[in-house]
A protein has these predicted regions:
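Conserved alpha/beta-domain cores
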Residues: 1-170
Length: 170
C-alpha cells in the first residue's frame, strides 16, 4: 500500500536494491494513491486496487461497525470513480491494473470494472465460471456503457440496477 509517489519510488528502489527481478507494482488502497495514479504508474510495472481498504479509507468507515458498514458496498459510485481513475491512469501508462477480492467476483461488477480499463481480476476459483461468462457475453462497448452508468448513479443500489439494465439492453 502506498499513499504517494515518494512511497512508490521508495518501494521500487528497495525491491531493486535487494535484487528483485520481474514486475514491481503497488497496491492502490488509499484515495490519494488512486487520485495520483498517473504519477504512480510512471514508476511501477502494475497497479493493483484493493477495494476493501480503498472503500474503508474513502468513506472513513469500518466494515465491522454496523451503522456505517453500508458504505463498504463495492457499488458505491465514488469507489467506482476511484477504481476507474486508477485503471485509466494505468492504461495511459501502458501497464496492467488489477482488482482483487470479493469485488472482482461479482459478474456484473466485473463488467463494470473492466469497462474503464481494469485488466485483471483476482478472485476465488468458484467465482471464475460466472465472471468469465459475464465478460464473454458483453462487448467492450457494453461494459464501458455499464461502467459509465454505474458511476453516474447516486447510490449503490442505483449503480447496480443501471449497470444490469445497461448490460441486459446491449
Amino acid at each position: 500500500m502506498v499513499a504517494d509517489l515518494d512511497d512508490a519510488q521508495w518501494f521500487v528502489t528497495a525491491c531493486r536494491d535487494v535484487g528483485l527481478v520481474g514486475s514491481v507494482g503497488v497496491m492502490i488502497e488509499v484515495p490519494a494513491a488512486a487520485l495520483r495514479a498517473a504519477a504512480l504508474a510512471a514508476d511501477v510495472d502494475f497497479l493493483s486496487v484493493g477495494t476493501n481498504d480503498l472503500a474503508q479509507y474513502a468513506f472513513a468507515t469500518d466494515r465491522a461497525v454496523g451503522p456505517v458498514a453500508r458504505l463498504q458496498d463495492p457499488w458505491q459510485p465514488a469507489l467506482l470513480d476511484l477504481v476507474a481513475c486508477t485503471a485509466v491512469a494505468a492504461g495511459a501508462a501502458g501497464i496492467p491494473c488489477g482488482v482483487c477480492g470479493k469485488t472482482a467476483a461479482d459478474p456484473t461488477l466485473a463488467c463494470v470494472l473492466v469497462g474503464p480499463g481494469v485488466t485483471s481480476l483476482s478472485m476465488g476459483a468458484g467465482s471464475l465460471p460466472a465472471v468469465r461468462a459475464a465478460l464473454a457475453t458483453h462487448t467492450g462497448s457494453a461494459r464501458r456503457a455499464a461502467a459509465a452508468a454505474a458511476r453516474a448513479a447516486t447510490s449503490p443500489a442505483e449503480a447496480r440496477a443501471t449497470a444490469r439494465d445497461t448490460l441486459s439492453g446491449q
